[in-house]
Amino acid sequence: MSGRRCAGGGAACASAAAEAVEPAARELFEACRNGDVERVKRLVTPEKVNSRDTAGRKSTPLHFAAGFGRKDVVEYLLQNGANVQARDDGGLIPLHNACSFGHAEVVNLLLRHGADPNARDNWNYTPLHEAAIKGKIDVCIVLLQHGAEPTIRNTDGRTALDLADPSAKAVLTGEYKKDELLESARSGNEEKMMALLTPLNVNCHASDGRKSTPLHLAAGYNRVKIVQLLLQHGADVHAKDKGDLVPLHNACSYGHYEVTELLVKHGACVNAMDLWQFTPLHEAASKNRVEVCSLLLSYGADPTLLNCHNKSAIDLAPTPQLKERLAYEFKGHSLLQAAREADVTRIKKHLSLEMVNFKHPQTHETALHCAAASPYPKRKQICELLLRKGANINEKTKEFLTPLHVASEKAHNDVVEVVVKHEAKVNALDNLGQTSLHRAAYCGHLQTCRLLLSYGCDPNIISLQGFTALQMGNENVQQLLQEGISLGNSEADRQLLEAAKAGDVETVKKLCTVQSVNCRDIEGRQSTPLHFAAGYNRVSVVEYLLQHGADVHAKDKGGLVPLHNACSYGHYEVAELLVKHGAVVNVADLWKFTPLHEAAAKGKYEICKLLLQHGADPTKKNRDGNTPLDLVKDGDTDIQDLLRGDAALLDAAKKGCLARVKKLSSPDNVNCRDTQGRHSTPLHLAAGYNNLEVAEYLLQHGADVNAQDKGGLIPLHNAASYGHVDVAALLIKYNACVNATDKWAFTPLHEAAQKGRTQLCALLLAHGADPTLKNQEGQTPLDLVSADDVSALLTAAMPPSALPSCYKPQVLNGVRSPGATADALSSGPSSPSSLSAASSLDNLSGSFSELSSVVSSSGTEGASSLEKKEVPGVDFSITQFVRNLGLEHLMDIFEREQITLDVLVEMGHKELKEIGINAYGHRHKLIKGVERLISGQQGLNPYLTLNTSGSGTILIDLSPDDKEFQSVEEEMQSTVREHRDGGHAGGIFNRYNILKIQKVCNKKLWERYTHRRKEVSEENHNHANERMLFHGSPFVNAIIHKGFDERHAYIGGMFGAGIYFAENSSKSNQYVYGIGGGTGCPVHKDRSCYICHRQLLFCRVTLGKSFLQFSAMKMAHSPPGHHSVTGRPSVNGLALAEYVIYRGEQAYPEYLITYQIMRPEGMVDG
């Protein structure tokens, strides 16, 4: 700060500066500085009001007064012409000074007089930077309320939030007094809410409860004024709470009609669904909110949508009357919508004698009114159909408009003729006392006025305001009504104009000459034959006229060219012809309306599309300052999206509107950028907002899965940060880089770990995410972890060498099997257990995202014996340990006191003496024996160390001569099979090199398993159905310490969120580095590596009553009445059997097998 300005941002150096200028100016500056308003009034003149402190920072009097918070002086200076945007030497405006020193009232005053809240000084500091740096909370709020942009960066690239004092940070994150804001919305305290409301917190969510936004609360408590204010300030009508309820759900549930109307008028989705697929109409119908139901139906609510219980809103209606009303009004609104769109097929579907005169509950429109107003070409046919069915031709709306009024106002002359011929009352009056002629005259529809006059409409009727039709018309209409139709043109020209209008191409050919081709309608709008032909959609006439010299640029009296006419009435072929013949698409009439303005205002989607394709500028403004987008009617969302261009696609992707995305996306814009924000692509937004279907569609149509935004984030970062598992899995399927880094070297795994996204972490690790990568601060994902589950997951995945000591797992390792000598206890295994977590998986299928395998128990005698053999707890080895020390006589004490080996390692002399071992020598021998067992000189596994918790894991090395070793090895070797993928996932091999087999002993896990086995056996007629099965996973380390954990299972597996096992070791081998082999071994990234050691578990699994399944079935739990699922091989399904359990305690990791796959004989590298 000090390097870019005087201390105080201009104000504090005021005094010194004032001393160095001429006396008169110095006196004025001093008066402003001291707040002496009387002296200021005496000294200020128009010449001096913006004088400069030439000896200082070239500040103005307003700079001084603002910096010192002299509100009265500031007000006087502004009233007398002080320049609110004046800049000093450092580029500061008075607002900078006021903000820097926290003068909130002065800030308000300056902003009201037009001060720019985003003005930047020479270092790109805005007033918000100033206020934030100094911790001026009130000023920050005022600035944000007046449009200050918090994302602006100074020349150092820092935003206001980056530089903010701790006290102001909460304002810039939207967290400042969030609870008070939410309470004010709930209680209806407007003053309190407006004092706190900013664009940064208008959509904040409560930290507890239902995670409601202010709009949720205001809607639920019927705070109409609060709802209006929130909507005016950008509240999101689509915001969802914890149960996916939108504010409209709340308003409808409690029957708040006005709030409901406000929300739907601001675009709330009337068919939005919560987590249970309840729509707002479900809520209103179930609570018997009759009027709200009617309102929702009028805005397109569908009462046939089903919730999660397969119940529609009609089903939930508590009374027969409401059920009937819902069905009736739904049919009626469907008929009205079909009439608006002039859709003959849908009209015939919904039309009946009962429905033909259905009236809109709010506007009282009938289908005939809607058809009369329809811009579509089949409106005449629809009107005739309705009239044949008995539509009331003189029915009036709430404003007393008849169908004739509506058609006349729209200049739909074809409908005017139809309804008049069916005896419509031509002089019917609306609520303003106006006839159809009044409305046609007011809109300047000359031909409509002629038509109405010809049918006997009285031009002398006076409206309630005292006007006749003549008085309301423009010059042409007035002339028509006063004098009748004049024949100012020559008879030949008149006939040519009429022929062009009527589409009589033969007459046009006969009369058209070089002189007459561009003749004018003298009595009318000075239109040419091309104007008429274009406006009346006479394609063949237009084509002929253009070929014979018609001026495509000719303007009528209002500055309209033929293209204006064609676009206004939606004549696509004509417009296309005119453009091909050189019509200027950005030409403007006298009111600066372009053809795009006309087409947009009239809802002509295809015309808008054509014009934009040929270079029409959607940013051009008419005389009223409106762009084409500003003129689009509320219901024309397709045109709004078209005109918004890339912004509409980004919005649709963000809101998850698949239909809009399909309509708006193309190969040219599928990777467009949010240029006003983070330069996100549609895929970034779809991923961040969990819009799975949209993300999938974008990826299928060329979206760049690894596109980076301004911060270097790819879509996978967004999905990972917000915990969107399904979206993340989809992105990975389309080859998203799981180790991509942003500008701060954060990977998706950093994001997921920091936010406690357990499922996401499991998914990323399973697909090759590297947990050792560090961000710019030198932090791994484990350093940022915020949840215990995530911590356990990352710890299991980290190579032991990369783990901090506090995270290293603890285990007793190197214990020999019974029968080993005493020396063996002091010489542990020479090769370490490679319990490192391997890379990734292609699909998450089970616990910790691993798909597991199993060994067939029917293969060998050894397997059968293994299944029958009980696995004792840790205490089985205490007898052998004591015997090896020659202290067998102490076993009675150990058995009496229930001392197991894991308890013994925690005991010292005092504890041993207390249980009755009085001889010092015996105690010493026991303690030293334990020390030798666990000391670093025993060749302990570098990945596993002592756990002193009393519930740790002991790994017991089996001797290759041991029958148990040989039985397990035989199971491994005999269950190798050739797989359909040709070795892609698990490598190319036909046998293993078994390096080590260790028995896993964990008393806690064993007791948990046996308890569950007993439960299953009791539930299955005393038959546990226990099997010895293989399990492959990159998380072996976590499993042998903590057991299997179904909480980390992912629903994306073939049989849902279970833990998977297999009979064949080669199948489990496919998953030791992740699903599909992940990225291969950690060192060589090779799925067929013959060097690196692998590890597999041979597990005891209780299957109980198993459900046989041949095809994929997504389940979160075992099928009812069953304990597991058995996936059987089939022609188009599995090649080898799979076994799935859904509770981790149904399996015990009995053997840890360390091995290598062996290269087949005769196979060469490459």
UniProtKB/Swiss-Prot annotation:
Ranges of residues in domain PARP catalytic: 959-1164
Residues binding Zn(2+): C1081, H1084, C1089, C1092
Any one annotated GO CC term: nuclear envelope
Xref: Pfam families: Ank, Ank_2, Ank_3, PARP, SAM_2
Lipid bilayer topology: Peripheral membrane protein
Residues the record lists as (3S)-3-hydroxyhistidine modifications: H238, H553
Post-translational modification: Ubiquitinated at 'Lys-48' and 'Lys-63' by RNF146 when auto-poly-ADP-ribosylated; this leads to degradation. Deubiquitinated by USP25; leading to stabilization.
Renumbered residue ranges of the record's region HIF1AN-binding: 545-553
SMART domains: ANK, SAM
Domain SAM positions: 873-936
Annotated InterPro entries: Ankyrin_rpt, Ankyrin_rpt-contain_sf, Poly(ADP-ribose)pol_cat_dom, SAM, SAM/pointed_sf
A molecular function (GO) term: nucleotidyltransferase activity
KW Acyltransferase (keyword) present: no
Positions carrying (3S)-3-hydroxyasparagine: N203, N271, N427, N518, N586, N671, N706, N739
Reported regulation of activity: Specifically inhibited by XAV939, a small molecule, leading to inhibit the Wnt signaling pathway by stabilizing AXIN1 and AXIN2. Inhibited by talazoparib.
Disulphides: none
First and last residues of every ANK repeat: 57-89, 90-122, 123-155, 210-242, 243-275, 276-308, 363-398, 399-431, 432-464, 525-557, 558-590, 591-623, 678-710, 711-743, 744-776
Any Gene Ontology biological process: protein localization to chromosome, telomeric region
Name this protein carries in UniProt: Poly [ADP-ribose] polymerase tankyrase-2
Organism: Homo sapiens (Human)
Organism lineage string: Eukaryota, Metazoa, Chordata, Craniata, Vertebrata
Originating gene: TNKS2
